[in-house]
Amino acid sequence: MYDYIIVGAGSAGCVLANRLSADPSKRVCLLEAGPRDTNPLIHMPLGIALLSNSKKLNWAFQTAPQQNLNGRSLFWPRGKTLGGSSSINAMVYIRGHEDDYHAWEQAAGRYWGWYRALELFKRLECNQRFDKSEHHGVDGELAVSDLKYINPLSKAFVQAGMEANINFNGDFNGEYQDGVGFYQVTQKNGQRWSSARAFLHGVLSRPNLDIITDAHASKILFEDRKAVGVSYIKKNMHHQVKTTSGGEVLLSLGAVGTPHLLMLSGVGAAAELKEHGVSLVHDLPEVGKNLQDHLDITLMCAANSREPIGVALSFIPRGVSGLFSYVFKREGFLTSNVAESGGFVKSSPDRDRPNLQFHFLPTYLKDHGRKIAGGYGYTLHICDLLPKSRGRIGLKSANPLQPPLIDPNYLSDHEDIKTMIAGIKIGRAILQAPSMAKHFKHEVVPGQAVKTDDEIIEDIRRRAETIYHPVGTCRMGKDPASVVDPCLKIRGLANIRVVDASIMPHLVAGNTNAPTIMIAENAAEIIMRNLDVEALEASAEFAREGAELELAMIAVCM
């Protein structure tokens, strides 16, 4: 029996396993549906290009047909191994915008506000470039570094952005977010530094930590409304793990998996559960609702040189050389995360913060890397950072081995369409600026024939895809309709919490891995200190005063 059963060894679950098992008196069980993270493609950064097709390491979900995207069902990759999506993502380290956390504070209290979040980000971070400062930490387990390799086209993109009157930003996690620049990544010595690598690998030998992989969670076990364990399927056999008296079940399966498991276990909207023959444990209608994601559209151009990372016979000598550089020195283009540069911009000058994000790739990327695009080219990803559209996760079946219903409801709010049109226009302006124009051969997609707003809208409906940031399906809040309270306890149930991206009340303006890790760090402290909501607010006030004092001291010393 265990004091804590953590379901899901992703970005959040690995942090929880580390922190909670640090107390040798507590027994911790970590369940993961996928295998151990031993595949070398996980740890070689450019291996990301081959991971989308791996059904072993990737849930490879499909959405429901999207009404506003010409009825298309979209591919939704999610990590299925130790480290979760942090083991298959592009490693971009972005915290989001300060205003995101002010909104969280409005929803869930000061312990989830900006001052507390910044404190945690700094505690977790081991930045390889920046010294310990107002914005960065150097003593944490999460390695954050500059890329060891940057393609000349990625540098040209940043220069072109400045030529298009966008400022250069040397630190997207610093004083301000706006601008173009190079992404810092979760890498160390040219290798991926996933949540598993950062928080789990170093504690595998702890005698009080049991890790069970290839264990597909099928049901949360309740006695009345108290969680007492978890059922899982491993090698077609059903197993159970139970908690001690007073022990807790911690759900960290992500914005898709957590609401799905709750509904399979009888927690959700009563009518939907009844429809699928699931016995009701607790009627909690908001489970699975409030789904938010970053919708993305690309500009793909052919290059007039062989500077990009290409798929061609002429690239073979460079590929062989790059392999040797990586194997023996951990250097070269195989250390690239592909999304080397990018930026944050406003769709219109009157906005008070960026609502568009760019990821520039010095290569062709077609269908999430699942289809090979031959030749030499480059791709600009453009995503709507602050979408207004909301979707849901639901049940398709009561069978735990069947995937859930995923309906992001993309572009259901017309403001999102307007934002993406603006993004295409700004993106084209950057790619037509002198530093990029000299590499330009022709626009492959959408093609130069697509010019008017109506033509751009139709292209968005035909081609837009996820950029992999689903959140919000077990919304945190102070209001009684929220799924979890500010201590992340599920309302109306006992001994069970949610700790992952599903608790975000609002999607952050940026990549979601770092914020999810921060959520887990905050949750671990709440759990270990046994804080209630009232104590949380008191602790947050103390943290705010301490943060303000620290910032004042830094300002004096600078």
UniProtKB/Swiss-Prot annotation:
Its EC number is 1.1.99.-. Its cofactor is FAD. GO terms for molecular function: alkan-1-ol dehydrogenase (acceptor) activity; flavin adenine dinucleotide binding. FAD binds at residues 3-32. GO terms for cellular component: plasma membrane. The active site is at 469 (proton acceptor). It catalyses: a primary alcohol + A = an aldehyde + AH2. It comes from the Bacteria. InterPro entries: FAD/NAD-bd_sf, GMC_OxRdtase, GMC_OxRdtase_N, GMC_OxRtase_C. It holds the Pfam family GMC_oxred_N. It is found in: Cell inner membrane. Keywords: Cell inner membrane, Cell membrane, FAD, Flavoprotein, Membrane, Oxidoreductase, Plasmid. Belongs to the GMC oxidoreductase family. Converts aliphatic medium-chain-length alcohols into aldehydes. May be linked to the electron transfer chain. This is Alcohol dehydrogenase [acceptor]. It comes from Ectopseudomonas oleovorans (Pseudomonas oleovorans). The lineage of its organism: Bacteria, Pseudomonadati, Pseudomonadota, Gammaproteobacteria, Pseudomonadales.
